[in-house]
């Protein structure tokens, strides 16, 4: 059974503020497994596509294969997140802070563009909370096809949203999951 997930404007605050990092997300699940994903950034003329286990960036009529970075450790990682206020509970804030305090560089306000940066090797880890399925189904195949890892904070399936961690490498992902699980 096929199911489409479409978010026409992921990053509504960016969109209404004129920040060009918003995007359109189109994801397809087959038998509840995300199998195809597109993140389109029309203001940047960038389209990130995952299909058949491959991830591509299409820009200016050219296609480039995507690959996550080789970052292996939190203390060398570039962390992205949309907004601190997405961590609704004090416990979620403490969990997020425990990773935030360990990374090399932090950036916020990137919406779905940070996932595009992760897939292309320019961001190493993304931690978010309060996501809906339409926020993440298109992103899952992109991160995985580019060589990254994505899960819920407890290491489970990210398909239904909630609290998500996406990482460039398995070692980095394992370090983050170990910290995130210790707070639960």
Predicted regions and their residues:
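Short amphipathic beta-strand/extended segments with alternating polar/hydrophobic composition
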Residues: 40, 50-51, 62-72, 177
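Residue-level signal for pocket-adjacent positions within structured domains
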Residues: 10, 23, 43, 61-62, ...
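An extended, acidic
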Residues: 67-184
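DPxDG-like acidic metal-binding loop motif
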Residues: 1-56
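Short loop segments at secondary-structure junctions
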Residues: 29-33, 43, 52-55, 60-62, ...
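A broadly tuned "polar low-complexity/structure-edge" signature
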Residues: 12, 51-57, 71, 126, ...
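Short, surface-exposed linear segments at secondary-structure transitions and domain or protein termini
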Residues: 24, 56-60, 74-76
């Amino acid at each position: 059974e096929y199911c489409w997930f479409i978010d026409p404007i992921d990053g509504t605050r960016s969109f209404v503020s004129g920040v060009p990092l918003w995007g359109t997300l189109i994801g397809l699940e087959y038998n509840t497994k995300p199998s195809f994903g597109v993140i389109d950034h029309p203001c940047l003329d960038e389209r990130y596509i995952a299909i058949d286990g491959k991830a591509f960036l299409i820009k200016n009529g050219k296609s480039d294969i995507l690959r996550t970075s080789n970052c292996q450790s939190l203390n060398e990682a570039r962390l992205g997140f949309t907004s601190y206020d997405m961590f609704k509970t004090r416990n979620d804030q403490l969990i997020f802070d425990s990773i935030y305090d360990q990374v090399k560089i932090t950036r916020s306000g990137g919406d779905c563009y940070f996932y595009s940066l992760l897939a292309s090797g320019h961001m190493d880890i993304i931690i978010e909370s309060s996501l809906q399925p339409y926020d993440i189904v298109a992103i899952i195949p992109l991160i995985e096809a580019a060589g990254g890892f994505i899960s819920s904070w407890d290491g489970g399936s990210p398909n239904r949203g909630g609290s998500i961690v996406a990482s460039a490498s398995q070692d980095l992902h394992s370090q983050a999951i170990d910290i995130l699980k210790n707070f639960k």
